[in-house]
Amino acid sequence: MKKIGLTGLLAMLFATPAFSSETYTFDPEYTIPAFEVGHLGFTTQRGRFDKTEGKVTLDFAAKKGNVEFTVFTKSLDMGSKAWTVHVSSEGLFNVEKFPTMGYKSDRLIFEGNKVVAAEGQFTLLGVTKPLKVTVNHFACGPNPINRKFMCTGDITATIKRSEYGMTKYIPTVSDDITINVPVESYRD
C-alpha cells in the first residue's frame, strides 16, 4: 500500500470539483404573480400582483434547493379601479390587514437537472398551509439580451380559498383559485 503525504492529500482535496448552491434573485419586472377565479358561474376573472420579491437557491449536484417569495397584496390589479378596490377589501384579499402573502418551499423536486415541483408552505390571510406547486418550463442559461445568467420557470398551483379563511361570495365566486407565478431570476 502506498502512503500519501499531507501534500498529496491536500492536492486531492483541492482537485476535487466543489459543487455548491447558487442563489438567484427574482427580477421584479418579469415575475408578476397572477390568479384566476370563477365568477358568477359564467366567466373566469384574472388578477395580478405587481410587486413581489423572492429568491431561489439551487444545488444541481445535490438535487436540492429552495424557493421563497413574498407578494405585496396592495399591488393587486384587477384591470379596473372599482374591481381592484372590491377584491382588495375585507372578506377577500383584505390588503390593509394582510399586506403580504407568500410561499416558502421545504424541498424542490428534480427530474434530472430540471426542477419540476416544490413542496412547501403557502401563507394567505395570515393562514399557513402545506402546498405542493408545479414548476413548468424550468430552464437556466444566459439571457439572450443582457447575457446575465438566469433561471426561469412557471410556478402553478390551485388552492381552496376557504381553507385560508377567504369565504366571501362562495359559491358565486368559486372556492378554487389558480395561482400562476412566472419566475425570471438572475444569479447573484
Please report, for each region that a protein language model flagged, where it lies by residue.
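N-terminal signal peptide c-region/cleavage motif recognized by signal peptidases
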Residues: A15-P17
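Repetitive helical segments and hydrophobic/amphipathic motifs
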Residues: A11-M12
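Low-complexity, acidic/polar, glycine-enriched regions of mature
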Residues: S20-D188
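Bacterial N-terminal signal peptides that target proteins for export
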Residues: M1-L6
